[in-house]
Amino acid sequence: MARLNRESVIDAALELLNETGIDGLTTRKLAQKLGIEQPTLYWHVKNKRALLDALAVEILARHHDYSLPAAGESWQSFLRNNAMSFRRALLRYRDGAKVHLGTRPDEKQYDTVETQLRFMTENGFSLRDGLYAISAVSHFTLGAVLEQQEHTAALTDRPAAPDENLPPLLREALQIMDSDDGEQAFLHGLESLIRGFEVQLTALLQIVGGDKLIIPFC
């Protein structure tokens, strides 16, 4: 058997996540997959919550490739690119959004979060508003992926409503939704958020005469 370490535990857990979903991901099943006794696993992960936290960090480390702004990039472009990358990372794994729910920045992510916040304040946001803008986009992305993954999982269990029973606008709306893999609806909502931040920021910068924004939106 290959030497057991934290990386091999995480690799096996990600495989098991894709096989069973988050509800089937247990420390007992993970130990079985690794061919070890459950107490041995506790040397690497103490419980399921610790395992999920580790998976959330690892998913982003492996697949979230736009966590920092590029040189000269606008804040609008960064929020957009960051959200799209975050979405792609969550979609790489079954129940990826559920894994990420309720997590907080890991110590390995502190510098990234600090850089993001500094970038937003350098672009005119107060710390509070920059934080809320980043959080709003993150929460929207997480919710959109959660809904998409839950919808996909439910397709096999829930029969489709007969078209003849649907009102005309609802029927057309469902056709629009069925023709979209979730990306177009996501981008539409994301742009609406960013435009809203633009309006608020522009209005407040005008109030303070173009100086650096130091008052919150609320």
Swiss-Prot record:
Coiled-coil parts of chain: none
This protein's name: Tetracycline repressor protein class D
Domain named HTH tetR-type: residues: 3-63
UniProt keyword annotations, A-Z: Antibiotic resistance, DNA-binding, Magnesium, Metal-binding, Plasmid, Repressor, Transcription, Transcription regulation
Residues reported to bind tetracycline: 64, 82
Amino acids binding Mg(2+): 100
Role played: TetR is the repressor of the tetracycline resistance element; its N-terminal region forms a helix-turn-helix structure and binds DNA. Binding of tetracycline to TetR reduces the repressor affinity for the tetracycline resistance gene (tetA) promoter operator sites.
Alphabetical list of Gene3D superfamilies matching this protein: Homeodomain-like, Tetracycline Repressor, domain 2
GO-annotated biological processes: negative regulation of DNA-templated transcription; response to antibiotic
Originating species: Escherichia coli
Self-association and partners: Homodimer.
InterPro entries reported in the protein's UniProt record: DNA-bd_HTH_TetR-type_CS, Homeodomain-like_sf, HTH-type_TetR-like_transc_reg, HTH_TetR, Repressor_TetR_C, Tet_transcr_reg_TetR, Tet_transcr_reg_TetR-rel_C_sf
Induction (free text): By the [Mg-tetracycline]+ complex.
Residue ranges of the annotated DNA-binding region, renumbered to this chain: 26-45
